[in-house]
Amino acid sequence: MSARPVLITGGEGQLASDLRELLDDSPVAAPGREALDITDDDAVGRTLAEVQPTLVFNCAAFHNVDLCEREEDRSFEVNARAVKRLAERCAEAEAKLVHMSTNYVFDGSAEAPYQEDDAPAPQSIYALSKLAGEYAALAYAPGALVARTGGLYGQYGSASKGGNFVTRMLQRAREQGELAVVADQRLSPTPTADLAAAVIEAVRAGAGGLVHLTASGSCSWHEFTEAIVELAGVEVEVRPTETTRPPGGARRPLNGVLARPRADALGLTPLPHWREGLESYMEAAGLLAVSGAPS
């Protein structure tokens, strides 16, 4: 990237960890939440003054989708108001802001994949707060890049979610002998290692504004789970179910697939197909079936 400093907020998360590994040609500060709470504007100001970054990746977020419904103020504080203050700080410091967002900003009612210029229609507190964060980043940090993505999983897992979807499904498969997974939600499951490489490429290309960055192709959560257990060599029934909304829970879009005409116009490399990405991740994590080994 450059020899100039880079700051990554939410530094202990899945994506941040992969960004940190790929940015090995730059000094990187990647404080976790305990070291830097982005809702603490004074702490953010001190960190920017100490690190003096030319590039800031905001990977901090409150992304427990159902909990956001019950903690609306916290959701907007972390995902929107703190982003506005961070964007203002980046503008003052002349640092480029890269802000991560979500496919949940769309309502999922369309049949085709969503393009960058399609109108958002958030259906949950989480989605609404993330959309507000997008607007804040673009309005208050000149040249900011907002990257929408979804279905993330990575080598480092998510502390707030107890690992990642792949490892959780494999654990349940081995413990329960049967899985029930929604078959009516479509998305493009994306390894954070592939996303990190794509985001860095976008920055190097000088991209600003809004881009969609997800794995190529799409599948349902049910199809994704079937691929996981197949690649792991675990013999288990994966039963398809329909989406239900738990009491007090968030509404999830049935179509979470993102198209990327703007990313393509910028000449950015498409991410690998979701199944290719899954196999690469599982191989690196030691999760692929070993020929002749029992499941």
Question: What are the functions of these language-model segments?
Answer:
Residues 24-46:
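Adenosine-cofactor binding site in Rossmann-like domains, unifying the SAM/SAH pocket
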Residues 4-22:
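N-terminal Rossmann NAD(P)H-binding glycine-rich loop of SDR-like oxidoreductase domains
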Residues 121-145:
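Active-site Tyr-X1-5-Lys
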Residues 138-187, 193-194:
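NAD(P)-dependent short-chain dehydrogenase/reductase
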Residues 84-121, 125, 140:
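Conserved Rossmann-fold NAD(P)-dependent oxidoreductase catalytic core, especially the SDR/UDP-sugar
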Residues 38-80, 89-91:
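NAD(P)H-binding glycine-rich loop region in Rossmannoid oxidoreductase-like domains
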